[in-house]
Amino acid sequence: MTEKLYEDPEFGIVVLRKNVRSRAVSIRVKGVQNKYGGRISVTVPWSLRYQDGINYLEKRREWIRDALNRQKKHSENAVLDGRSVGVIADGTSLNTLISKIIFIEQPTMSGQLSVKIRTAPSEYPEAMSRLWYSIDRPMMLKQIIFPPEASQPGLRKVLVEVLREEAKMLLDMKISIFAERYGFQYRKLTIKHNSSNWGSCSRAGNINLNLNLVRLPEPLCDYVILHELSHLKEPNHGPGFHILLERLCRDNIKGLIAIGSTDAEKYKAWIDGDTVSGKTLTPLNEVLSREVSSWRMV
């Protein structure tokens, strides 16, 4: 596959790609920017010219506009309900499984560009002894104090480091518990920050988990971890993989409900059986996968 950049007067950077396996010109519009700063890519069969891709783009302008508008609306809704992080400003807040993070703008007396993080419990001590996590009831409060001159990339970098610190603690603990409980052996866990996937498992048994997992409700966070652990026994997404993952997901939800998790209660129907009012339920692992896909990474 080879690629070329095209500067469109309306849409900005468009990535043109030639692919030997493509049989027709196709267009993809993503909700997040790619590494070139654009959101649109055009794939062209190897036998055609890049100009053929540009010509097809011209014909599909109205469709692209609609797609961009739909994604903009979707992104705005995602910010409102916490599934995405928009522009960071004074008062911006987001919840993780561990903490409520609030950004506070304060001028600095020294004139130096510095960011401070304050941490304090957000619940009564007796409430912090619960065994389950919830983004609706984080245990800690973290204030990120920043000056007016702070840039968006700078503030996002600070946020990423806060999430990384929480992910290293929580995800390492969770994967260790799951591995022991369900009989998995992995070599190494690495916490990653990327926008392409929530997790991955290598043939060597190394597991990567995205630091954004701490922003998901606990059943969804656990689903991703169990998904990657399942690949240690079932490398592909065949029937065996889905049977194993479904069993693990149901057992985990059952355990969360037993210890009082309010986020797990919505999946109680899958613990009681495979049907509701005579209708067969969609496999739980598929439901959890769809819900994870509605979240946006920082």
Question: Which residues fall in each region the model found?
Answer:
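Active-site-proximal or metal-binding-adjacent scaffold patches in catalytic folds
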Residues: 1-223, 232-298
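Walker B catalytic acidic pair
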Residues: 228
